[in-house]
Amino acid sequence: MAKEFSRSQRVSQEMQKEIALILQREIKDPRVGMATVSGIELSRDLAYAKVFVTFLNVLTDNADPDTVKNGIKALQDASGYIRTLLGKAMRLRIVPELTFAYDNSLIEGMRMSNLVTNVIKNDVERQVNPGSDEEK
């Protein structure tokens, strides 16, 4: 029976769960806020991991880009501690070196959804009032 997923995919899924728990329970830095792990890119040799995070406070507050930069900086500063806790939780021979990156796909998805909603709303308005657009 062939393996459905490679080892690096299985490890990255487990690592995503563990890092999410660590961020939720262990990291007390206020700059991090409510960070969620949206994905992990793991190298084939499991030596490097790029952790993609989103910040829920950025989604709700329309926060400035400095909030994101400060959050990523705080996570990068705590990466050694997170790596230590990850090593204890997962019992890997080699714990990957962690780098954190902001994942803006959720915000972009919301922006695209709003654009589509506005276009549909404008289209419905044009169908109801067909002559009002030509006068403008």
UniProtKB/Swiss-Prot annotation:
Keyword tags: Cytoplasm, Ribosome biogenesis
Localization, UniProt: Cytoplasm
Protein name: Ribosome-binding factor A
Listed Pfam families: RBFA (PF02033)
Stored InterPro entries: KH_dom-like_a/b, RbfA, RbfA_dom_sf, Ribosome-bd_factorA_CS
Functional note: One of several proteins that assist in the late maturation steps of the functional core of the 30S ribosomal subunit. Associates with free 30S ribosomal subunits (but not with 30S subunits that are part of 70S ribosomes or polysomes). Required for efficient processing of 16S rRNA. May interact with the 5'-terminal helix region of 16S rRNA.
UniProt main location, coarse: cytoplasm
HAMAP family listed in its UniProt record: RbfA (MF_00003)
Similarity comment: Belongs to the RbfA family.
GO molecular function: ribosomal small subunit binding
Quaternary state and interactors: Monomer. Binds 30S ribosomal subunits, but not 50S ribosomal subunits or 70S ribosomes.
GO biological process: maturation of SSU-rRNA
GO cellular component term of the entry, any: cytosol
Keyword DNA-binding: no
Domain of life per record: Bacteria
Organism annotation: Yersinia enterocolitica serotype O:8 / biotype 1B (strain NCTC 13174 / 8081)
